[in-house]
Design a protein with these regions (language model features):
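Short alpha-helical interface patches
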Residues: 47, 51, 91-95, 119-123, ...
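Mixed-charge, glycine-accented linear interaction segment located at domain edges/termini
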Residues: 39-41, 100, 104-155
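Short cysteine/histidine-rich metal-coordination sites, predominantly Zn2+-binding motifs
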Residues: 154-165
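The feature marks the first
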Residues: 1-48, 55-59
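Short, low-complexity, polar/charged sequence segments that are solvent-exposed and flexible
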Residues: 34, 46-49, 58-60, 106, ...
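Short, structured motif recognition centered on aromatic/hydrophobic residues
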Residues: 24-29, 49, 53, 96-99, ...
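Intrinsic, low-complexity N-terminal interaction/targeting segments
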Residues: 1-20, 25-26, 64-112, 116
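Short, well-structured hydrophobic secondary-structure segments
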Residues: 35-81, 88
Length: 165
């Protein structure tokens, strides 16, 4: 079993990528004091998390000054792969709590990570996540699959000719 983490008041919370568009690997990273936790995510998870955080924050009072977008510390290796994400708001502590569960086989028990972050930190996370997702390859206007710089075999054209852009 992987290691579980509980960081009730993170100093830094960010999402980031390693690699070029089309070959990027997405990560979420949190730190509290000297402790850094890096977890691997899917692009769709980053997109969903960013969208949900935006909707969640819209229902709360406006956050204060947003911290500068934190860069991913690529020297810290990923500990495990994210399976499910959950969010809650602790009104007493004025913290958004991210609960992340490890992706494991059905019969296995996975690790859990809990990150408590300020509204400002999660607002910055939502913005950065949306920017990273948008920075990927543009979608094909016909099929929606990503367009590669070296070409695109579009299923809507049976792969015979590239779509006219």
């Amino acid at each position: 079993m992987s290691t579980s983490h509980d960081l009730p008041a993170v100093d830094r919370l960010t999402v980031g990528t390693i690699g070029s568009p089309g070959e990027r690997t997405f990560f979420i990273q949190a730190s509290q004091g000297p402790r850094i936790v890096t977890l691997k995510m899917e692009k769709a998870q980053v997109a969903a998390l960013s969208q949900y955080l935006g909707r969640m924050l819209a229902g709360l009072s406006r956050p204060g000054h947003l911290p500068a977008a934190a860069e991913l510390d690529a020297s810290d290796p990923s500990e495990w792969v994210v399976g499910t994400l959950g969010l809650s708001y602790d009104a007493e502590a004025d913290r958004v709590v991210l609960v992340i569960e490890e992706a494991v086989a059905e019969d296995d028990e996975g690790a859990t990570a809990r990150f408590g972050a300020t509204r400002e930190q999660v607002a910055a996370l939502a913005i950065r996540g949306a920017q990273l997702v948008e920075a990927g390859r543009p979608p094909c206007p016909l099929c929606g699959y990503p367009l590669d710089p070296e070409g695109h075999a579009c299923p809507r054209t049976n792969g015979y000719r590239p779509p006219k852009l």
